């Protein structure tokens, strides 16, 4: 079945077991908020400022041992998260911060409330990414939660452009994490071991 990116976002939160979302609405994230309206099992907490919500998500993560989750709009909404993201990074607190973004074709054109939040936060989080294809949305969210909670826990930023939120695509959520990178071989090659031993002699 096909659903839009905003509904896929909600499904992803439910699949990841998110029960509390700290959020502040705005134009480039409004479709995500609309999709959350009927979502079951997710309590939305709406502080009066984005900085308050990121610190609240940090406190939630520290007190529950779960990933704290934020949702804000682009521009000042996103930049108001920066201190909280840095705090979570320095204290190894798992957060996933979702930011709305202008449509892909407007990125780099100085559009209203366009800001390079990935560039701003890259040095203060474990991973920051802009979703550029609707078919990558579910995988990126799955990876974001995995990255936030594994190894040294910390914050992850996922920037979702408005056209990705509206684009139609599969409703399938991945069951496994798929991150490109080094995957060590678990088997041994006897011939290579013999050759290495021979070279040591």
Predicted features by range, described:
Residues 1-201:
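N-terminal alpha/beta PP-like core and its mobile active-site loop of ThDP/TPP-dependent enzymes
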